[in-house]
Design a protein with these regions (language model features):
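A short, flexible loop at the N-terminus of ABC-type nucleotide-binding domains that lies
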Residues: 1-6, 12-24, 73-74, 107
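ABC ATPase nucleotide-binding domains
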Residues: 78-79, 85-236
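Conserved ABC transporter NBD signature motif
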Residues: 61-69
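Glycine/charge-rich catalytic "coupling/switch" loops of P-loop NTPases
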Residues: 262-315, 333, 343-378
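Helix-to-loop junction immediately C-terminal to a conserved catalytic motif
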Residues: 53
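ABC ATPase nucleotide-binding domain
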Residues: 5, 28, 64, 351-353
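The feature captures the beta-strand-to-loop junction immediately N-terminal to the Walker
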Residues: 38-40
């Protein structure tokens, strides 16, 4: 296994246009960490993974795996194993032959090949499927074979490029568990790309949040940290809105009172909200944006909250264990997630409490103010 270091890495597909895809990417990935690259389409997450694999050139900057600079090292010599979105199995070969193939090309002896393949099959639960061809396997089984083909190479770093996106919802959940167990079994360095932030939150030791690069931006690496760090303390509105499901609600307003650990915001709706936020770097009258997660909102009859607002119900979804209510709050979409059924119908007015400890606040440049408390819903 190995650590991975990226220093001032940049990617530009067309230097004549002076438009970078990735800029000033600086990351240090520890040996054995599970790192997830996440972001919307066009943010460069798969490009960054392919640069680590050696499938894309690095325009500027330095990539190290262990203590060796890899910029000009061919993919086959980088010590990485890659699993793609497509399974890419040989249809005329059975499971065992697919897993053996790469080792045979590298001229490993028969005993080594058999030992590695049998070990990978045991880890992945493929023992009973070794004589089957890909057409006789389910999607999840095919993906396990693709992972097994990488395991037998014993790479220093595993690279996963959206490996679950071709699977249905139930199978994605099952395979997430399998990949998490695999990481614990191998204690390996894994770099994993996904557009699904739920996958990122459930699998990662740390998450890299990337955004589509703005021309004037220094970098499109928005934040690098643990899942809970990104959830509770996002550095900006982009990260706050991307991490968490359903997405965070945002409402515009202005600061009307600033204290050491709290502030008051008058929303454009006219409601005044108290937030446990240190806003002392701003001034009274500054325009801000309040953020509140759907799961932190509670109908006022269940919440003794001084801060509250109301909206008109557009849709109510009752799922048994939880409910989602979609409100129109002064023309803005607003989502409430509750742990039980909320007795409302389309067209009703619903008033919700906003706990001060649950508030996030962002300035006019969308940078987050420091939160001074963490909300614990009881």
């Amino acid at each position: 296994m190995a650590e991975v270091t990226l220093t001032n890495v940049r990617k530009n597909y067309n230097p004549d246009l002076l438009k970078d895809t990735l800029r000033n990417i600086n990351l240090y990935i520890k040996d054995g960490e599970f790192i997830v690259f996440v972001g919307p389409s066009g943010c460069g997450k798969s490009t960054l993974l392919r640069m680590i694999a050696g499938l894309e050139d690095i325009t500027d900057g330095v990539l190290k795996i262990g203590d060796k600079v890899m910029n000009d090292v061919p993919p086959v010599d980088r010590g990485v194993g890659m699993v793609f979105q497509s399974y890419a199995l040989y249809p005329h070969m059975n499971v065992r032959q697919n897993m053996e193939f790469g080792l045979k090309l590298k001229k490993f002896d028969k005993d080594t090949i058999e030992k590695r393949v049998n070990n990978a099959a045991q880890i992945l639960g493929l023992d009973a499927l070794m004589d089957r061809k890909p057409k006789a396997l389910s999607g999840g089984q095919r993906q396990r074979v693709a992972i097994g083909r990488s395991i037998v190479q014993q790479p220093d770093v595993f690279l996963f490029d959206e490996p679950l996106s071709n699977l249905d919802a139930a199978l994605r959940v099952k395979m997430r568990i399998e990949i998490a167990k695999l990481h614990k079994e191998l204690n390996s360095t894994i770099i994993y790309v996904t557009h699904d932030q739920v996958e990122a939150m459930t699998l990662a030791d740390k998450i890299v949040v990337l955004s589509p690069l703005k021309e004037s931006a220094e970098t499109n690496l928005e934040q690098f940290g643990s899942p809970l760090e990104l959830y509770h303390n996002p550095t900006n509105k982009f990260v706050a809105g991307f991490i968490g499901s359903p997405k965070m609600n945002f409402l515009k307003g202005q600061l009307i009172e600033i204290g050491e650990e709290t502030c008051k915001v008058k929303l454009n709706t006219g409601d005044v909200i108290t937030a446990c936020v240190d806003a002392r770097r701003a001034s009274v009258g500054d325009k801000v944006e309040l953020g509140i997660r759907p799961e932190h909102l509670v109908p006022v009859e269940h919440q003794d909250s001084k801060s509250r607002l109301s909206g008109m119900v557009q849709v109510a979804e009752h799922l048994g264990a939880e409910s989602f209510v979609y409100l129109d709050v002064d023309g803005e979409d607003f989502t409430v997630k509750a742990a039980s059924e909320i007795p409302v119908d389309t067209g009703d007015s619903l008033e919700v409490g906003i706990p001060a400890e649950a508030c996030y606040l962002f300035d006019a440049q969308e940078k987050a103010f420091k939160r001074t408390a963490r909300y614990n819903r009881t």
